[in-house]
Swiss-Prot record:
The lineage of its organism: Bacteria, Pseudomonadati, Pseudomonadota, Alphaproteobacteria, Rickettsiales. Catalyzes the methylthiolation of N6-(dimethylallyl)adenosine (i(6)A), leading to the formation of 2-methylthio-N6-(dimethylallyl)adenosine (ms(2)i(6)A) at position 37 in tRNAs that read codons beginning with uridine. PROSITE patterns: MTTASE_N (PS51449), MTTASE_RADICAL (PS01278), RADICAL_SAM (PS51918), TRAM (PS50926). Residues 3-124 form the MTTase N-terminal domain. The keyword Amino-acid biosynthesis does not apply. This is tRNA-2-methylthio-N(6)-dimethylallyladenosine synthase. Residues 383-446 form the TRAM domain. NCBIfam families: miaB-methiolase (TIGR01574), MiaB/RimO family radical SAM methylthiotransferase (TIGR00089). It is an enzyme of class 2 (transferase). The keyword Acetylation does not apply.
Amino acid sequence: MSKKLYIKTYGCQMNVYDSVKMQDLLYPYGYEPTENIEEADVIILNTCHIREKAAEKTYSELGRIKKLQDARKKQGLNSAIIVVAGCVAQAEGEEIFTRTPYVDIVVGPQSYYNLPELISKVVRHEKHLIDLDFVEEAKFDQLPEQLYPQGASSFISVQEGCDKFCTFCVVPYTRGAEFSRNVEQVYREALKVVSSGAKEIMLLGQNVNAYHGKTSDDKVFTLADLIRHLVKIPNLERLRYTTSHPIDMTDDLISLHGLEPKLMPFLHLPVQSGSNKTLKAMNRKHDRDYYFDIIDRLRKARADIVLSSDFIVGFPGETDEDFADTLDLVRKVKYGQCYSFKYSPRPGTPGATRTDQVPEHIKSERLTILQKELAAQQLAFNESCIGSTMKVLFDRDGKFDDQIIGKTPYMQSVYIKNPNKDLLGKIIEVKITKAALNSLSGEIYR
């Protein structure tokens, strides 16, 4: 009789990738995935620590799981094994057992390949097991090949960790130093997902454009080299990468956007602030003019490229003038979509120790203003697509029986009616007929 595995994933695409790998790791040990937490024998929360709210979601969910465990106990059923994985695990470690003593395992993002052994120890009645080692090479050497197809679009982790040490960010402390997978590993995984039906691959990394992976003969590949290598794979039709740091946007990578048709004309390039003073305080290692120059060069290389970004409002010391500079940058760049957040002090980071914290109500006011501007830009871009014909990769069912959803080269969701679902996994030309803030609607172009 098979055992059931439930995984809940928080945060970035890297965590989504890691969750898939956890699933693949445990399948040979008899654990089959389920979406029903009540029938799970093992429950894994793969967590995010980038903001306080994200971290507290973990403890809220653990509280709900505790109630589920108590109910099972009353019914005479076995308790599930509870695992906290990911960046909250790495950052808080033993504190998780203190706050939630019913958790069995705490495992970091670089050591989850040990989950089969850790779970087997819990089955043998060991408790409060923790593994937070930083050994990236061991992680990627130990991870299995893909067992479950990811669908028409697949994630592949090629780079992990960060050496930039932005003063607001916990990633260097939770994911470790920058590390690049070797080229052959990445290529084999790409071949596997394409043979399983993927038409698109998203290359993942905390600073993916800092990729410097080695070949079997010790030649070092940049991200541009890796992309040129991967696009040769038959039946791979689209390639993307995220997340990028402006200072690692090389001339070669920028020019590749204009030369390689399989590289999609959409780039997520976080800037965080439009104020030079704030950028310096954040230790971003560039100023606004440098960022503008990167954008100009990208648009010269490929005129139809669309940008997205991340913004933090209310970083310590941010003044009204600094915030005005951020709005000015947003209006000059004109983004297709963006993510924006209030600054959240993270324990252990330099930003958290500053005495010039911005009051919460000012952060909220600034975020409202910024998000209004970003939403207007996103809607304007979506509306500009009405009447055009776009190639859409259909990758999932819609809410209604006769509906399927795909994405454009610019990562916009597109809804169409297709009762037979025969277009899933295919790239089809669609005429865009309607636009909303977060999606497009269309019909098959005949």
